[in-house]
């Protein structure tokens, strides 16, 4: 019984470390994803001398003015 209890506790603990899948490709590159410890994904959009730039990743960072930030909370929501 003790061993079974330890196995159940281990499984429950491992499930608590759920990771989210966020897109992490830049601008118009082919879609790529990464597993994140954060519970959100972001998409930053801004314009510079090269045109419209897009950065994607994990979390929800603070941005400077002039940068559009979208944060979301489902897998691959920042594509």
Swiss-Prot record:
InterPro entries: Snake_3FTx, Snake_toxin-like_sf, Snake_toxin_con_site, Toxin_cobra-type. It is found in: Secreted. Keywords: Acetylcholine receptor inhibiting toxin, Disulfide bond, Ion channel impairing toxin, Neurotoxin, Postsynaptic neurotoxin, Secreted, Signal, Toxin. Residues 1-19 form the signal peptide. Pfam families: Toxin_cobra-type. It comes from the Eukaryota. Coiled coil: none annotated. One of its GO terms (molecular function) is ion channel regulator activity. One of its GO terms (cellular component) is extracellular region. Disulfide bonds join 22-41, 36-58, 60-71, 72-77. Expressed by the venom gland. Binds to muscle nicotinic acetylcholine receptor (nAChR) and inhibit acetylcholine from binding to the receptor, thereby impairing neuromuscular transmission. Belongs to the three-finger toxin family. Short-chain subfamily. Type I alpha-neurotoxin sub-subfamily. This is Short neurotoxin 2. It comes from Hydrophis cyanocinctus. The lineage of its organism: Eukaryota, Metazoa, Chordata, Craniata, Vertebrata.
């Amino acid at each position: 019984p003790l061993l079974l209890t330890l196995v159940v506790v281990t499984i429950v603990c491992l499930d608590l470390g759920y990771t989210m899948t966020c897109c992490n490709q830049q601008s118009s590159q082919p879609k790529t994803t990464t597993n994140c410890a954060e519970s959100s994904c972001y998409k930053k959009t801004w314009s510079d001398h090269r045109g419209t730039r897009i950065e994607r990743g994990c979390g929800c960072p603070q941005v400077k003015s002039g940068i559009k930030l979208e944060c979301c909370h489902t897998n691959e929501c920042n594509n």
